[in-house]
Amino acid sequence: MPEAQVVVNIGPGKDITLSTGKICKLANGSCVTRMGDTTVLSAACSGAAKPGQDFFPLQVDYREKYSAAGRFPGGYIKREGRPSDKEILICRMADRPIRPLFPEGFFDEVQVCGLLLAADGINDGDVLSMLGASCALCLSDLPFQGPIGALRVGMINGEYIANPTNEEMEKSSIELVYAGLPDKVIMIEGEAKECSEAELEGAMRFANEIVKKMCAAQVELMEKAGRPKKDPELHIVPEDMAAALKSVTGEKLENACLIPGKEARMKALDEIQAEAVEALKAEYEEKYGEEDFMFFLKMGFDKLVQKIIRTAILEKGYRPDGRGVTDLRPLTADVNVLPVVHGSGLFRRGETQALVIATLGGPQDAQETDLITGGVATKKFYLHYNFPNYSVGEVGRIAGPGRREIGHGNLAERSVKQVIPADFPYTIRCVSEIMSSNGSTSMASVCGATLALMDAGVPIKSPVVGISCGLVTDDTGKELILTDIIGAEDHYGDMDFKVCGTLDGITGFQLDLKLPGISIDTLARAMAQNKEARAKIHGVVRDCIPAPRPELSPRAPQMEVVKINPDKIGALIGTGGKNIKEITESTGAQVDIADDGSVSILAQNKAVLEEVKRKVQFYTAEAEIGKIYRGVVKTVRDFGAFVEILPGQDGLLHISEMANYRVQQVSDICKEGDYLTVKVIDIEKGSGKIRLSRKAALDELDK
């Protein structure tokens, strides 16, 4: 592979360099993508299809190593381990736009690996990895029908920005990750601060113009250094067997495909498939062999079901569960469904049901992530999504969260976090437990999280709800957008477009396609249809709980932030942490101290909170002129004694101020460790030195 490179300008002072041929020469295709000093290697390799495999085993991987930023991994083990959530999310984001661009029936193993080689802390490597994955596949001999372009779009003061820096993203009201062909969109994902549909559409059209440049640059690089494409081996059901399968299933299969209930429909389809196996086994098992016979039959049966469902939708507007094109499934919403917990919400849409639990905590419960590409990120709100086997009535391996669960939780989290006030002091964790599933569980999680937060008394700005729209097309260009898709429509349809938002705007979105791209116009129509559906769901949520509860759940911990003089932080902590340890151990409260003097207190109840506040005030109190204190003698000198009147605050009690008579020796009045009643008679400006008088204190107390 000869060395070659191209440069794409995506905005003022923003160039992306794509190069190949210098490193990673044994891969089918490789590319080094660079923007600023952030550099990502992408490599594509392939292997033969496994016997009996009836799907495309594309694997996309992305890793960020600390060495890319000139750092060591933290902790005892100085080596990176399992992928982080961020890396997993980038893998999913890179997978979705390239998967539809391989030919149907191509089942070879394909692996695309992204590796962050250098991180400048300004530009993130995620969209560079997506672009590099496309370029590596284009340069390879694999039957990839690209190239695609990929970039992030932000919006600051109404102006769109391509691949904004980390600093620019903090000011942006939209974060759109866009991937597509020169004339079509394939994947979008992101979040927004209640943006309008028009603003999101504008961001997509802005991104599409840059994608055209990216695709042209990759074509140029392919001409310089690309490998010739090989003819792929496609696994397609033989025509004779496909015709025989259609004949034996006939009208019975058509009727079964349109049974409204998921469980009843799946049972009927399984029975018909079993009958087809028995009917065709004798003839075709001998012809193709036992393994290939079952392979072709399952694939052919699935194709028949797909065609029946799609034809019914397109030609008759008839969906598998009997709804109209824009109809929603039956909706219900409940709150306060569990005891003990801080907040809970149960949201049901048809056969999909999500139970979400909200838990409130303090600053110590926030999640800190050391981002290699740009500092430490602290999350005060996080949402975890769990999809157990019983939610689909199946038995399976029980393990930790997979990529899908991490991805669904992230979408719901990004969508809901937009309405949580920035000054809300609590850390919040929402856990979505999917009770049953027939499509759009992530959107049910968004609705359930809104219910749980409002039940817990979290003062969210506005309820957030979500809904998914699907798409069915044919070869003539006819297309139909479906509102609130079920599992079968997701599986056999062309699109899963999730949009979340309040009544004022969009907060989160994600597009998955099986087609090699659709027009932005089609996506804009889907957004309009989605908006109408969200308004109906908002009505259901508000009927259940019109607004957040006026007070936090009585089961939630009490939290308050008090301000102290930053100079008193040392006094509050104490020598070796003595004071702060005494506070936390005696009360069981969490106390977090910020550099600006903000002290966050998290206590189990109001009484404990007040006790902690009293202790904080005691350790951080300022000496006042004219006030009498009971202090302990810390040091004795010939000229007087130093008395600690407040934690960390000593004052000089001069020998002349010890009594109403002449004191010959300090030891006649006190020794170290004695307690004395003294009055502050002066505090020196600038130095803050305190002068004390026992004589004045005794005179005042005798009055």
Regions found by a protein language model. Name each.
Residues 1-46, 233-376, 557-571, 579, ...:
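Extended amphipathic alpha-helical scaffolds
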Residues 1-7, 11-14, 28, 39, ...:
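Alpha/propeptide regions of enzymes that mature by internal proteolysis
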Residues 29-31, 123-141, 335-358, 438-458, ...:
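Conserved phosphate/anionic-ligand binding catalytic regions in large, soluble enzymes, centered on
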Residues 96-104, 139, 362-365, 388-393, ...:
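Conserved helix-loop functional segments at active or binding sites
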Residues 104-110, 145-147, 214-232, 263-264, ...:
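Flexible, glycine/charged-enriched surface loops at secondary-structure junctions
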